[in-house]
């Protein structure tokens, strides 16, 4: 299988608007021990679980859900904080702030395709189309991510 890297998506943490870290503009990931953590996709390998594993952190899980909107709503209700991908931080608008984490953590976004000798002609055409399409629209994708960074 061939992995084709397209972009790195910065990782964030959703906190209630009145959370002390909002004034800092960044969330020190070790601060998680002082907060109630809402585990999104519990028991599964997720971007959040991989991020915590990379920092050797075991967050104090208070609530669990497999629904991103439920996690967002719990954060908005002041029940805790949760991690979120940069491309997803503006799905809903409420009393929640998405803060970049420190140290920063990025999630690679790309496509996986069979090796050149094993890829079907249709899959090869789609791969080629997707790569051209992404390259032509990469600026727009970056604008969306950078716009998220400002919110």
State each model region's role:
Residues 1-10, 24-25, 70-118:
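Beta-alpha-beta core module
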Residues 16, 40, 114-115:
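Residue-level recognition of the GNAT/N-acetyltransferase active site
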Residues 17-18, 43, 85-88:
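Short secondary-structure boundary segments
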Residues 21, 28, 33-56, 119-127, ...:
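Secondary-structure junction motif
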Residues 30-31, 53-55, 68-79:
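Short helices/loops that flank or line small-molecule/ion binding pockets
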Residues 39, 58-67:
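Short beta-strand-to-loop elements that line the ligand-binding cleft
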Residues 53-62, 96:
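A local structural motif
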């Amino acid at each position: 299988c061939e992995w084709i890297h397209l972009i790195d998506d910065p990782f964030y943490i959703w906190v209630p608007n009145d959370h002390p870290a909002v004034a800092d503009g960044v969330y020190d990931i070790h601060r998680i021990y002082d907060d109630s953590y809402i585990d999104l996709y519990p028991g599964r390998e997720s971007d959040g679980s991989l991020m915590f594993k990379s920092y050797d952190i075991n967050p104090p899980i208070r609530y669990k859900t497999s629904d991103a909107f439920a996690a967002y709503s719990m954060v908005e209700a002041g029940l805790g904080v949760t991690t979120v991908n940069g491309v997803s931080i503006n799905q809903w608008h409420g009393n929640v702030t998405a803060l970049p984490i420190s140290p920063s953590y990025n999630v690679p976004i790309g496509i996986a395709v069979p090796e050149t000798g094993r890829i079907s002609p249709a899959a090869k055409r789609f791969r080629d189309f997707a790569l051209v399409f992404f390259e032509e629209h990469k600026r727009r994708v970056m604008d969306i991510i950078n716009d998220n960074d400002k919110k």
